[in-house]
């Protein structure tokens, strides 16, 4: 059911007139969700294999381009994207706006010059919690442009994706926006890849006794009660570039019927990230895993796109109503560090 559902639901279709611009598009996970909701997209991405993947599978065109402030974009009614998140990831060095990989000045500049009806970006949860000072700056700059800016931490598992994946979703608009409702039930690993687990014939993916021993030592030292295998009766752990492509202690792995354990293959990882089976990836295996690990789950993107469609069709608020909806950055109600920590960051 899950496989058939994503294969059909996420097929691109053109039913909307609004044009969507996807910045830092990656392989097209976010764009795929918007195309499935009926939008036309155009993307920009600096990684060649990801661009090739996007162009192989989507109706829109992705351009190989390293973006910078002042870049000349085509007209767009909606801007979406995933500004590089490495500076804020719990796995990164957390240098924030001092990091050259920070894409927010570019995203804000695009919004400033194109003035879309709606914008939406995805980033790691850590941006809103450990880096309140920078997130407030981003929201303040976007609010100055005349947008109501709202955000929420969403877990993809609550929207049909068979994976626990918390991400910060931020939306700017001039009307009203409702985040998608939580789905009734969670999709499990077994439902997503159960037909693949024991049919994959790739001996190179089988964990060696030495790798099993290394993992056992790691889990003992980290007080891990249950092995970090993927369990058929529950959703997967968060997929990352590191635990997909690397042979590490926290690698994504399944247990076979004969007791051996195996690393995931690309198609299994893609399913767990809600990419349809007809969606084909370009590049080496490592590059394909990186594309999957960095992507916005298309099924989550689709749910967000449907909500954006509702907002896009609403009349723009009058000035009085707009001012009543603007929320000061320090009233977001999130648990952050204190002012001293902000100044030291």
At which residue positions do the language-model features occur?
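S-adenosyl-L-methionine-dependent DNA methyltransferase catalytic core
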Residues: 1-40, 45, 141-145, 153, ...
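Short catalytic/ligand-binding loop motif for oxyanion handling, primarily in non-cytosolic enzymes
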Residues: 31, 86-90, 127-130, 160-163, ...
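Short Asp/Glu-rich motifs
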Residues: 53, 72-73, 130, 161-162, ...
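Short, conserved loop/turn and helix-capping segments at secondary-structure boundaries
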Residues: 97-101, 132, 136, 183, ...
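Proline-centered helix-kink/hinge sites
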Residues: 83-84, 116, 162, 276, ...
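Short aromatic/basic micro-patch
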Residues: 82, 118, 263-266
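Core alpha/beta nucleotide-donor-binding catalytic domains of modification enzymes
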Residues: 2-115, 125-127, 136
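Conserved Class I SAM-dependent methyltransferase catalytic core
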Residues: 103-164, 169-172
């Amino acid at each position: 059911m899950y496989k058939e559902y994503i294969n059909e639901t996420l097929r691109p279709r053109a039913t909307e007139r609004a044009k969507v611009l996807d910045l830092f598009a990656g392989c097209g996970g976010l764009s795929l969700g918007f195309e499935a909701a009926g939008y036309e997209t155009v993307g920009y991405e600096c990684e060649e294999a990801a661009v090739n993947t996007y162009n192989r599978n989507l109706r829109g065109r992705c351009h190989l381009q390293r973006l910078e402030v002042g870049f000349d974009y085509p007209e767009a009614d909606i801007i979406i994207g995933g500004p590089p998140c490495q500076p804020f990831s719990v796995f990164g060095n957390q240098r924030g706006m001092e990091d050259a990989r920070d894409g927010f000045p570019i995203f804000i500049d695009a919004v400033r010059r194109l003035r879309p009806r709606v914008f939406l970006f995805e980033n790691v949860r850590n941006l809103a919690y450990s880096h309140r000072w920078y997130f407030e700056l981003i929201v303040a700059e976007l609010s100055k442009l005349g947008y109501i800016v709202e955000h929420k931490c969403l877990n993809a598992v609550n929207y049909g994706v068979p994976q626990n994946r918390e991400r910060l979703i931020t939306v700017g608009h001039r009307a009203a926006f409702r985040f998608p409702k939580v789905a009734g039930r969670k999709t499990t690993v077994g439902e997503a890849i159960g037909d693949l687990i024991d049919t994959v014939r790739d001996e190179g993916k089988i964990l060696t006794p030495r790798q099993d021993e290394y993992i056992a030592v790691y889990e003992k030292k980290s007080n891990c009660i249950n092995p970090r295998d993927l369990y058929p009766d529950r959703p997967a752990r968060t997929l990352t570039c590191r635990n997909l492509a690397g042979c590490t202690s926290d690698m994504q792995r399944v247990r076979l019927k004969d007791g051996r354990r195996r690393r995931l293959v690309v198609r299994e990882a893609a399913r767990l990230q809600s990419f349809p089976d007809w969606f084909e990836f370009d590049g080496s295996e490592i590059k394909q895993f990186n594309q999957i690990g960095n992507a916005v789950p298309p099924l989550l993107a689709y749910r967000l796109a449907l909500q954006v469609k509702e907002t896009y069709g609403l009349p723009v608020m009058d000035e009085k109503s707009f001012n009543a909806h603007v929320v000061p950055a320090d009233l977001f109600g999130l648990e952050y560090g204190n002012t001293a920590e902000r100044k030291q960051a």
